Amino acid sequence: MLKKSFFALNRSWLKYERLASFPQRVRRIPVPGQVTYLFNTPFEKTTDLKLTVGAEVTRGQPIVLKEGRGGRRASTVTGVVAAIASHDGNFGRRYTAVTVTTTHPETQEAADGGFAAHAAAPDLDTARTYLTSAPGNPPLDCLADDRRPIDTIVISAMEEDILIGTRQYILKNDFTAVARGIDVLRQISGEMRIVLVVPRDSVQGFGHIGAEVMAADVDYPSGHSLLIMNNLLGKPVPTGASPEDCGVCFFSIEAVATLGRAYTDGTVPVRKTITFIDKAGAQSLATVRVGTPVAAVLSAFGIVLNDRDRLIFGGPMTGQAVHDANHPILADTDAVLVQDRDSIPYSSDYPCINCGECIRICPVHIPIDMLVRLLEVGQYQESADQYALESCIECGLCGYVCVAKIPIFQYIRLGKYELAKERAVEAADD
C-alpha cells in the first residue's frame, strides 16, 4: 500500500503489510530428504571437530560441531550426518555446513533429543544448549555475555521488511506461546525490563501479557531496531555501536514463541514460519523445518526457477539474493521472495541527477547524494568521516526512490564491508 504526503518530506509512504491480506491457510512443507545447518564458524578454522560424517542424530538433539560459542545447535530431523563442508556467504562470510540425511520418517514428529528432562525448570544454560538457532533464532548468547551486560529485552512483532506477515501471524495466532515465552525469559534472564513492540494498529489486548507494550508506526521502516531504540526507548545508538552495546537485546516475537512452546510441550520446536512471495507477488504463509532446502519450498508452491530469475531471502527492500536453490531455510528466515527475470527492477550506472528524493526519504537524515558519490569511487573512509556511512540503518528507501536507478543500497553495504576490511588490515599491521 502506497501513500505519499506533500508535507511529510521525511516520512516513508511504504506501509508494513497487514495480515488480513494473506490467505488464512498455512501450508505445511513436508520433511525433506536432506537438511543443512550453517554453523557460524569458518570450516577452515574449525579444529578439533566433535562431529563426524556418519554420526546419527535425533530430532531435538544438540549437534556439537566444536566447543564454544556458535559450535552447537539442535537438529530439526532424525538422521545421519552426510557431509561437513565449507559454505560461502555474502560479503566474505564463511560458514561450516553440516548436511543431515533424514531417516525413520515415522519418528520425525516424536523424537525428543533430551530436552524434556530440563523443561520443568528453565535456565539459561539449558536454553542456550537446545534453543539457540531454534525457529526465530533466539539470541540467548547475548544474555550470557558478561562483556555487554543487558538490562532490557525488546520483543519485536514488527516485520523486517514490507510484504511480510510472519511476525504478525505469530502475534495473532501464538499469543499463548508468546505469553509463556515472556515468562520463560523472566526466569532465565533475571529482573530485566521486557518490552513488547507491536504495530500501532494492533496495540489493543496485550495488557496482561507480562511485558511493557509499546506501539510503533506502520510506516516502513519504523520497526527497525535502531529506530525503536531512538523513537520508543529513547536510547540513541552511537555510530558504530549496536543495541547490545547499549544494554538492549532484541528478540523476534517468533523467538519468544519458540521458548514458550519448548517449555510448554517439553520438545524443541523445529518448524519455522515463513512468508512466501511468488513471481506474481502473491503472498502465502508456510511452516518448514529449519535447514530445509529452499528448493523444497518452491516445489511445494509449484514454482519453477528459470535462468536469471532471482531468489531472495527476506523482503524486496533489504532481502539478500541467494545463488543456489539448495540454500537452507535458516532460523531467522522470515520470508522467501521469487522475482521473475522480466520483473526485476533494473539498476544503472547513470550519475546522480540531484533530485533530492533520497535525502527527503532517509529516516536518519544522511546526505545520500554526496555519500554515494564517494562510495562509487571507493572512498570508504572519507564517506564515513564526511557523510556518516556508518550511521545508515540499511532500510533501502534511498535506492527505492532513486530516479537514476543507482544501486545505492548495494553501494552502502559494500562500503561498510570494505571499510571494515580496511580497518582490520590496519589493526593487524599495528
What is the predicted function of each stretch?
Residues 83-89, 304:
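Short, conserved beta-turn/loop elements at beta-strand boundaries and strand-helix junctions
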Residues 52-65, 80-83:
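Short, well-structured beta-strand-loop connectors
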Residues 88-152:
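Acidic low-complexity segments
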Residues 134, 143-145, 188-292, 300-305, ...:
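Hydrophobic alpha-helical positions that pack around
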Residues 1-50:
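N-terminal, Lys/Arg-enriched amphipathic/low-complexity engagement segments
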Residues 221-223, 227-236, 264-266, 302-353:
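Active-site gating/interface segments in enzymes
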Residues 58-71, 96-102:
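Short hydrophobic beta/alpha edge segments that flank linear recognition/processing sites
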Residues 335-349, 359, 363-430:
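Ferredoxin-type iron-sulfur electron-transfer modules in oxidoreductases and energy-metabolism complexes
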